[in-house]
């Protein structure tokens, strides 16, 4: 996979929303429950060991509550991620590949694991896919500003320059 896509709205109707300036100020996109790669690795190991990864992924896909904020949602294609949002982002996820659960000595039914390394320990990008939503990539690690572009009309520009 080369890119994942994410749409967001500006603040309206009581929802906080985020502008590209706020995403840039935050340093990029980060799950609610993982501010670092090490936290994301630990979260994945814990959810797999507890047998709750699939249930947490389902809850996140359905409700997007902070309590299930082990992930942030992206689409594996433009159509999945875009629904008339005010802002549309492209995240560089070069090197992210589907791997077998055997890298964790586990088998999580209904879930696929994606890493940009050969193990969880040497990966800096970790994501999962719940089988019911095969084009919704649930990223568990922060994605920093330099890896993010924002759509401006018909062109993509680096978020750092927006």
What are these regions (language model features)?
Residues 1-162:
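NAD-dependent ADP-ribosyltransferases
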